[in-house]
């Protein structure tokens, strides 16, 4: 059995802590033989290989009595880069418990559990459902809308350095004025409406006009300004920080992607530039 979970890119500018897309990088968990103790085989640095691994901790939270197994973990989702690496592990852990303990959890229940563990829905929602997901968590009320993402190409610049979510959150202001909040909300409303309508020109402008977080976080990613400037000049719809950063995501017309890719490659930035696509399936279990 293989559990497959996509990477995710959250916020999309003004959709702070509530909007995300699933993209084509993956965590795969292969469940092998039973053992006396848990063994998670992987090649990641500073990640536990025993029951302290987040995958196993999540599974045991739901089903404490499941039998230990040899688990093979494969992932091309980089850690601490704003692509939902921890969310993918949490979602995989929930599915691991669901399969081994035969819990028969609905997708909505998996989403609720993942949101409770993660603390916010913006990454776990697209990791589970795929595509574009807009979600809201207010007290005990959790709602979401899944929608197809408009036609666009994606480029991701993944820096060779980490940016911890805690550091990125520390850069945010403690309060927004009422006037600022109204303006930020109107921008977010337009961004979502344009995405649902398939109007990437208007969506792109709204994404880049975010007032909730990018103004304060851009300085933490030294490449952001030059990437945004070149991408816009070359015809991109929008450039935004993926999640808490430092990954920078570019949305562009299909016919512009190769030109933008080459322009950014010529900058010789310290990181990896990748072409990505929207993942449409979300969480998968392969037998």
Swiss-Prot record:
Pathway: Amino-acid biosynthesis; L-threonine biosynthesis; L-threonine from L-aspartate: step 4/5
EC nos: 2.7.1.39
Compartments in which it is found: Cytoplasm
Keyword Cell membrane on entry: no
Pfam families: GHMP_kinases_C, GHMP_kinases_N
GO molecular function: ATP binding; homoserine kinase activity
Annotated Gene3D superfamilies: 3.30.230.10, GHMP kinase, C-terminal domain
SUPFAM superfamilies referenced in this protein's UniProt entry, alphabetically: GHMP Kinase, C-terminal domain, Ribosomal protein S5 domain 2-like
Keywords for this protein: Amino-acid biosynthesis, ATP-binding, Cytoplasm, Kinase, Nucleotide-binding, Threonine biosynthesis, Transferase
Chain positions recorded as ATP binding sites: 78-88
Keyword Amino-acid biosynthesis belongs to the record: yes
One GO CC annotation: cytoplasm
Catalyzed chemical reaction(s): L-homoserine + ATP = O-phospho-L-homoserine + ADP + H(+)
Family: Belongs to the GHMP kinase family. Homoserine kinase subfamily.
Name of the protein this chain belongs to: Homoserine kinase
Organism in which the protein naturally occurs: Streptococcus uberis (strain ATCC BAA-854 / 0140J)
